[in-house]
């Protein structure tokens, strides 16, 4: 009887999916179903990624075009942009005041660069110490180790960087290089990770991989000169979401059932860069389109039938008094993830958490500014380094006082 009911429920769900499916849904299903087939599977699998990116792009095209048109029609927009970029150091200092010492804030900041940061990728990668290190059992669970050749004798603080990509692209290539190279130059050990993505790996596979990387670092990073007792995590866009969620769900059994018993997935600090922090809210057209994208591509379940999945995946709903220190960075003119996401998240953190919460809102900056905007990227990477170094010093000082 139970088997009949299960079969009936499956059949009803299948019919319901057929009735609401669109052409892109069929392409995604074809790619996922055919990806494991011999011979042709490897050719069908990329179709899912391309389709998923297309679905994501279609949902943001109108916002992007609207913002672009508004800019073009705004008198004196070039002067406004110049002034916004010139204010990066000033707003960064203001955001860190009270968190970072005045002496550290007074040191010389990086000069703005004219060329897009992506053009300097090779220069940053001189700090890559080891490539394609496995952090899990799956061949896709890879990381690069960034560090100086002349490491200090004592264990170095560690940063795990989680790249973005709308939860359908999780490659460590290009992303985060300015932050990784700056911290590596200062003696940190940095781990830049890949993780598995939709549509072939639906949620919560993404966060499970991030948790696996954290547990791996806690157990193994000392082999590369890192301090297993200080692990920070940072990420941009989808990686910002994953970093925040990881920081707020330390050792949550829901997200580490696959890990060995006793694995430690806690982190000591979080930096979220233009991240998405709410998977539930559908109060605006933009947010409703985003949830629809999650339902169709990332989660592959509906929020009406599985509200707990979307709630549990929302960092804004997971904030507790014991949250680690946070630095949240967002551009005021982000048309992919509107800045209200960051503002609401920071408000929640400051109301609940006992730890320090920094918020750096960059005037005029858009999504992905750290790849395209040389005037902002250097100072922002410097601000992140100041924040993380301060958290590390405070933690070390506290440990000495306890001893």
Swiss-Prot record:
One MF term in the entry's GO annotations: acetylesterase activity
Organism per entry: Mycobacterium tuberculosis (strain ATCC 25618 / H37Rv)
Keywords: Cell wall, Hydrolase, Secreted
Name assigned to this protein: Esterase LipC
Places the protein is found: Cell surface; Secreted, Cell wall; Secreted, Capsule
Catalyses which reaction(s): a fatty acid ester + H2O = an aliphatic alcohol + a fatty acid + H(+); a butanoate ester + H2O = an aliphatic alcohol + butanoate + H(+); a hexanoate ester + H2O = an aliphatic alcohol + hexanoate + H(+); an acetyl ester + H2O = an aliphatic alcohol + acetate + H(+)
One of the record's GO cellular component terms: capsule
Entry's EC annotation: 3.1.1.-
Broad class of the protein's primary localization: other
InterPro entries, per database record: AB_hydrolase_fold (IPR029058), BD-FAE-like_dom (IPR049492), Carboxylesterase_B_AS (IPR019826), GDXG_lipolytic_enzyme (IPR050300)
Pfam families: BD-FAE (PF20434)
Family: Belongs to the 'GDXG' lipolytic enzyme family.
GO biological process: glycerolipid catabolic process
Secreted listed as a keyword: yes
Residues at the active site: 237, 334, 367
Task performed by this protein: Esterase that can hydrolyze short-chain esters with the carbon chain containing 2 to 10 carbon atoms. Does not have lipase activity. Is highly immunogenic and elicits strong humoral immune responses in both HIV-negative (HIV-) and HIV-positive (HIV+) tuberculosis (TB) patients. Also elicits pro-inflammatory cytokine and chemokine responses from macrophages and pulmonary epithelial cells. May participate in the progression of active tuberculosis both by contributing to the utilization of lipid substrates for bacterial growth and replication, and by modulating immune responses.
Domain of life: Bacteria
PANTHER family: AB HYDROLASE SUPERFAMILY PROTEIN C4A8.06C, KYNURENINE FORMAMIDASE
